[in-house]
């Protein structure tokens, strides 16, 4: 049996970009936020749960750095970690997200406590970090390519939220504005790594599955939020109205 022919770099990039059809910008929960149909509680719930994603992104990037023997790659990839954690004496994306939380009426200490993080969101994010730790560095780096679609989602929030949610302090939108440029820069680097590393048909198909895995994570996070904040079915809703789910267990 002859081996399947590998896609050309242009064809492979096209296949990667086609995965954008499954990006979470199309999830009903996100569509409702974009169209102005989200309640204050739903916006706050989204911000609180996405904070768990934000604080774990540097852990994901640190895992990639730890597994990568290529100094030139590390020199460029480390900027992602600084973008979120902040350089010495400077705020990063995590502080910007805390300001977004304040802008929608959440207390920063409550965000930091992660007490509002739903189990489904926690499990999805943890799966992403664990993948980055266990996979080879090229696969972990390539899993970040949902950034191909990120500028569109950040711009959609900047375009629609000020119009639909005047109660949100506009200073909270700093994170989205900053990420517009950062995401475009990160895409160029991540895409170059991916196109260079995956040169066989089997490897390219595996990479498409890895990208789908990351898309599954983002979609599943919104599924959990939709259950809790749209359908009013948070975990254990049938037996208690208390937030009894675990708040994170340190090994």
UniProtKB/Swiss-Prot annotation:
CDD domains: TenA_PqqC. It catalyses: 6-(2-amino-2-carboxyethyl)-7,8-dioxo-1,2,3,4,7,8-hexahydroquinoline-2,4-dicarboxylate + 3 O2 = pyrroloquinoline quinone + 2 H2O2 + 2 H2O + H(+). The keyword Signal does not apply. One of its GO terms (molecular function) is pyrroloquinoline-quinone synthase activity. It comes from the Bacteria. Belongs to the PqqC family. This is Pyrroloquinoline-quinone synthase. It comes from Pseudomonas syringae pv. tomato (strain ATCC BAA-871 / DC3000). The gene is pqqC.
């Amino acid at each position: 049996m002859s081996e399947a022919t590998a896609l050309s770099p242009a064809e492979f990039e096209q296949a990667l970009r086609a995965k954008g059809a499954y990006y979470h910008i199309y999830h009903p929960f996100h569509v409702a936020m974009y169209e102005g149909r989200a309640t204050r509680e739903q916006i706050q719930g989204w911000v609180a749960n996405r904070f768990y994603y934000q604080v774990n992104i540097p852990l994901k990037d640190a895992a990639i750095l730890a597994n990568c023997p290529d100094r030139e790659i590390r020199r460029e990839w480390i900027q992602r970690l600084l973008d979120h954690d902040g350089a010495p004496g400077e705020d990063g994306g995590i502080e910007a997200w805390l300001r977004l939380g304040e802008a929608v009426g959440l207390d920063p200490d409550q965000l930091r406590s992660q007490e509002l993080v739903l189990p489904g969101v926690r499990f999805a994010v943890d799966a992403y970090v664990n993948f980055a730790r266990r996979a080879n560095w090229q696969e972990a780096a390539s899993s970040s390519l949902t950034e191909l679609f990120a500028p569109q989602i950040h711009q959609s929030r900047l375009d629609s939220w000020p119009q639909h949610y005047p109660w949100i302090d506009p200073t909270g939108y700093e994170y989205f504005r900053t990420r517009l440029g950062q995401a475009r820069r990160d895409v160029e680097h991540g895409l170059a790594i991916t196109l260079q590393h995956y040169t066989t048909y089997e490897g390219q198909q595996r990479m498409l599955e890895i990208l789908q895995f990351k898309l599954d994570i983002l979609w599943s996070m919104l599924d959990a939020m939709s259950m809790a904040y749209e359908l009013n079915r948070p975990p254990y809703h049938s037996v208690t109205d208390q937030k009894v789910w675990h708040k994170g267990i340190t090994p």
